[in-house]
Amino acid sequence: MTKKILLVDDEPDVTFTIKNILEDNGFQVDTFNDSTTALKSYKSNYYDLVILDIKMPKMDGFELYNKIKEKDPKAKICFLTATEIYYEKFRKLRTGLGKTIDEDYFIQKPINIEDLIKKLTFIMNNKNDE
């Protein structure tokens, strides 16, 4: 069965590029360039993985993470980040739901295609809730 991914990034070039890469590797990908619209359209128990950019206007990736987890506690979510600073910040703040996120759930930009596919496959197959 085809794995379904939701990708949210405020930069259309990024969503376009990553969507094409993932679809070329057999994934079905829905994209949004606005976190508020993504949240309104989110379907619980539909996606195998959600990929969120951290730095977005209106609602950043951390806030969107918390809102998705409120709707769908078992959602597997990872983050795109241009810097490791965000990982450290998030690790210290924790999420509003009292969980910390493992470093494996952060995907560093610029993206290496092979590493991206390996990391996403690992996350989707990981039985542990992050």
What residues fall within each predicted segment?
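Receiver (REC) domain active-site loop signature in two-component systems and cognate sites
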Residues: 56
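Alpha4 helix (beta4-alpha4-beta5 surface) of REC/receiver domains from two-component response regulators
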Residues: 63, 84-107, 114, 118
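Conserved phosphotransfer cores of two-component systems
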Residues: 43-45, 67-75, 98-101
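Acidic, metal-coordinating helix/loop segments flanking the phosphotransfer/catalytic sites
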Residues: 31-49
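Acidic catalytic/metal-coordinating carboxylates
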Residues: 33-34, 60-64
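The C-terminal output helix
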Residues: 118-130
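Two-component/phosphorelay signaling modules centered on CheY-like receiver
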Residues: 12-30
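Active-site residues of response regulator receiver
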Residues: 9, 53, 81
